[in-house]
Amino acid sequence: MMKTEPRGPGGPLRSASPHRSAYEAGIQALKPPDAPGPDEAPKGAHHKKYGSNVHRIKSMFLQMGTTAGPSGEAGGGAGLAEAPRASERGVRLSLPRASSLNENVDHSALLKLGTSVSERVSRFDSKPAPSAQPAPPPHPPSRLQETRKLFERSAPAAAGGDKEAAARRLLRQERAGLQDRKLDVVVRFNGSTEALDKLDADAVSPTVSQLSAVFEKADSRTGLHRGPGLPRAAGVPQVNSKLVSKRSRVFQPPPPPPPAPSGDAPAEKERCPAGQQPPQHRVAPARPPPKPREVRKIKPVEVEESGESEAESAPGEVIQAEVTVHAALENGSTVATAASPAPEEPKAQAAPEKEAAAVAPPERGVGNGRAPDVAPEEVDESKKEDFSEADLVDVSAYSGLGEDSAGSALEEDDEDDEEDGEPPYEPESGCVEIPGLSEEEDPAPSRKIHFSTAPIQVFSTYSNEDYDRRNEDVDPMAASAEYELEKRVERLELFPVELEKDSEGLGISIIGMGAGADMGLEKLGIFVKTVTEGGAAHRDGRIQVNDLLVEVDGTSLVGVTQSFAASVLRNTKGRVRFMIGRERPGEQSEVAQLIQQTLEQERWQREMMEQRYAQYGEDDEETGEYATDEDEELSPTFPGGEMAIEVFELAENEDALSPVDMEPEKLVHKFKELQIKHAVTEAEIQQLKRKLQSLEQEKGRWRVEKAQLEQSVEENKERMEKLEGYWGEAQSLCQAVDEHLRETQAQYQALERKYSKAKRLIKDYQQKEIEFLKKETAQRRVLEESELARKEEMDKLLDKISELEGNLQTLRNSNST
């Protein structure tokens, strides 16, 4: 992810990749500060204060570079006097990424390391004459000096093609001559420096001792702090390092050629096979470095500390030391480049001074580590100059893990490119600008995030062929098995369990199951096979059969072998923390079925063995051999299975060792070994004694319990006899009650019959009563009707009597008259 910010004169610069930052830092470090641009006038020297380490490095390079003889001066004296700037040399210390170290490196220690490297590089020159001695050497100047003088003479007229061709020829000769003088350093860091190889057949290496001092001192150092009053010299992040490579370079400013296409493969990244010396020198016309910008990347980092020499009144040699540190952080990589200037002063003048290095922030880009008094226009001036690699000497150190220490290889097609005029591919040199983001129309005033509209620089990187993306060492079956186990753990219900491990252990047995177990891949899941009755797990009750053991005391048991899991469980002590995975309710996996089948198979095998032992037991019974109770008491069957005790056993067939025949060292070694075995055996005997004592106590407890049980059995027998008497009485009572019940049942049946008969009679009487009532009602009606008829007849008779009496009266009256 690239972070774009508006670039101002004081704003932070950006870089696109660690490769590019390393290249730009090298270019900026090798530019003389007094060199103006093509269309600007030269400016005054930068008045900076430098530390003593920089002066020492510069003095060493001056010793190496000012040993030219009269024969060399005859042809190149004028060139030395007229050269506007001298050739430059740098020593690069490269510390690539490694996982075993993560520590801060002191800047002063790295500068001391650069000083020792410069001493090593000075041995390339065959003349040991110091710079202060103007006496002519006893033999003609070396090819390195001739090459340097040729570069100085060709600096004013860099456009001349014939001088460039002559320089290329001399470089090829120098490359062939320096192949046998290549330096190899192998430094192995396993927490500290262990093994070192020789640099040369006759060269002693103080560099390696300083390296070890740097990394050992960095263990107790938590950070780097800049001292008061000193300019910021470098930003040194945390260093992870197993590899150290130092490069000595001589640069020449030829005319700038067109930039190479970004798709070319970098030839210098390929390694030559062991035993071959690759060509170490090349002419690399460099392109103008683009403006660095701030970049945040998670990649291996290359941090360069380059010493820039202060411009002097007369044009002279400029010696620069360049230290490159590949730093890989644990949480990501940062890019930080800093330049520490190195003026020409006597080494002994500022020897006790210490120059502190300030820690650069992770997001700072290339150029942020420069001294604060450097003006932006001076930086732009130095960026306009072009440099090319004229000489390259690699001092490589590898981690010693079976790799070659032959250094980096330059292929033969580099020479063809140089002859054809094509510049070699530089992966850090090319970039393309694309339009940035468009202006926002109406940004919210309260928003805190603003996007830059500056152009975006797109940097080229290495092609795919340069990266090793092969995975032949990955076993697909093992990887898929582990993947399936991890997916299975995600589907399980996880919960923690803590158990207290007692003398009988944890009370569980395990079984490993997983894909690829039959092919020896051993990417297994560890499941609970059985839970011992009465053990710690059984008393706790949370761990069940078929549960998956995910972790034990923080150690993951997913995708491990069964032996590893068993050793982890054996080594636990005291309170043991488990992470248990269990199938969710309603889910039935094939693991439970497999464990069940395994248990059934073991049960079947146990039954077969018991049958065999039963046959042997029958034979023993025929011979009259019986086991006594004492034997049974001495050999109890524990619920946790048989007790497995590991004891170191000496080989029985081992020959008797004679102290006279053996050497004292072997005797001491054998004695220590026997002491260890004796101590282990004593510990196991003590453990067995403790277990035997606990078993004796348990045996006494069992005897007491047996007596109590026998007494309770006698009491229960008496109770049983009483209960039997009660039961007989109850039986007779039950028989009497049964007879009475039968009689009562017979009476009940007779009464039932009488009741039914009476019920029928009652029904008959009720029917007859109904009929009688009906007859009574009919007769009453008939009587009422006859009464009415008789009454009417009486009324008629009475009327007739009264009528007759009247007639009689009238007759009497008439008669009387």
From Swiss-Prot:
<dbReference type="GO" id="GO:0001560">
    <property type="term" value="P:regulation of cell growth by extracellular stimulus"/>
</dbReference>
<dbReference type="GO" id="GO:0032587">
    <property type="term" value="C:ruffle membrane"/>
</dbReference>
<dbReference type="GO" id="GO:2000474">
    <property type="term" value="P:regulation of opioid receptor signaling pathway"/>
</dbReference>
<feature type="region of interest" description="Actin-binding">
    <location>
        <begin position="1"/>
        <end position="154"/>
    </location>
</feature>
<dbReference type="Pfam" id="PF00595">
    <property type="entry name" value="PDZ"/>
</dbReference>
<dbReference type="InterPro" id="IPR043446">
    <property type="entry name" value="Neurabin-like"/>
</dbReference>
<dbReference type="GO" id="GO:0071466">
    <property type="term" value="P:cellular response to xenobiotic stimulus"/>
</dbReference>
<dbReference type="GO" id="GO:0019900">
    <property type="term" value="F:kinase binding"/>
</dbReference>
<feature type="compositionally biased region" description="Acidic residues">
    <location>
        <begin position="410"/>
        <end position="425"/>
    </location>
</feature>
<feature type="modified residue" description="Phosphoserine">
    <location>
        <position position="17"/>
    </location>
</feature>
<feature type="compositionally biased region" description="Basic residues">
    <location>
        <begin position="44"/>
        <end position="58"/>
    </location>
</feature>
<dbReference type="GO" id="GO:0030027">
    <property type="term" value="C:lamellipodium"/>
</dbReference>
<feature type="region of interest" description="Interaction with ADRA2A, ADRA2B and ADRA2C">
    <location>
        <begin position="169"/>
        <end position="255"/>
    </location>
</feature>
<dbReference type="GO" id="GO:0034695">
    <property type="term" value="P:response to prostaglandin E"/>
</dbReference>
<keyword id="KW-0524">Neurogenesis</keyword>
<dbReference type="GO" id="GO:0030308">
    <property type="term" value="P:negative regulation of cell growth"/>
</dbReference>
<dbReference type="GO" id="GO:0060179">
    <property type="term" value="P:male mating behavior"/>
</dbReference>
<dbReference type="GO" id="GO:0031749">
    <property type="term" value="F:D2 dopamine receptor binding"/>
</dbReference>
<dbReference type="GO" id="GO:0007015">
    <property type="term" value="P:actin filament organization"/>
</dbReference>
<feature type="modified residue" description="Phosphoserine">
    <location>
        <position position="116"/>
    </location>
</feature>
<keyword id="KW-1003">Cell membrane</keyword>
<feature type="compositionally biased region" description="Pro residues">
    <location>
        <begin position="131"/>
        <end position="141"/>
    </location>
</feature>
<dbReference type="GO" id="GO:0007612">
    <property type="term" value="P:learning"/>
</dbReference>
<dbReference type="GO" id="GO:0030426">
    <property type="term" value="C:growth cone"/>
</dbReference>
<dbReference type="GO" id="GO:1901653">
    <property type="term" value="P:cellular response to peptide"/>
</dbReference>
<dbReference type="GO" id="GO:0042127">
    <property type="term" value="P:regulation of cell population proliferation"/>
</dbReference>
<dbReference type="GO" id="GO:1990780">
    <property type="term" value="C:cytoplasmic side of dendritic spine plasma membrane"/>
</dbReference>
<dbReference type="GO" id="GO:0003006">
    <property type="term" value="P:developmental process involved in reproduction"/>
</dbReference>
<keyword id="KW-0539">Nucleus</keyword>
<feature type="region of interest" description="Actin-binding">
    <location>
        <begin position="164"/>
        <end position="283"/>
    </location>
</feature>
<feature type="modified residue" description="Phosphothreonine">
    <location>
        <position position="207"/>
    </location>
</feature>
<dbReference type="GO" id="GO:0051726">
    <property type="term" value="P:regulation of cell cycle"/>
</dbReference>
<dbReference type="GO" id="GO:0043025">
    <property type="term" value="C:neuronal cell body"/>
</dbReference>
<keyword id="KW-0597">Phosphoprotein</keyword>
<dbReference type="GO" id="GO:0014069">
    <property type="term" value="C:postsynaptic density"/>
</dbReference>
<dbReference type="GO" id="GO:1904386">
    <property type="term" value="P:response to L-phenylalanine derivative"/>
</dbReference>
<feature type="coiled-coil region">
    <location>
        <begin position="671"/>
        <end position="788"/>
    </location>
</feature>
<keyword id="KW-0965">Cell junction</keyword>
<dbReference type="InterPro" id="IPR001478">
    <property type="entry name" value="PDZ"/>
</dbReference>
<feature type="region of interest" description="Interaction with TGN38">
    <location>
        <begin position="595"/>
        <end position="816"/>
    </location>
</feature>
<dbReference type="GO" id="GO:0016477">
    <property type="term" value="P:cell migration"/>
</dbReference>
<feature type="modified residue" description="Phosphoserine">
    <location>
        <position position="94"/>
    </location>
</feature>
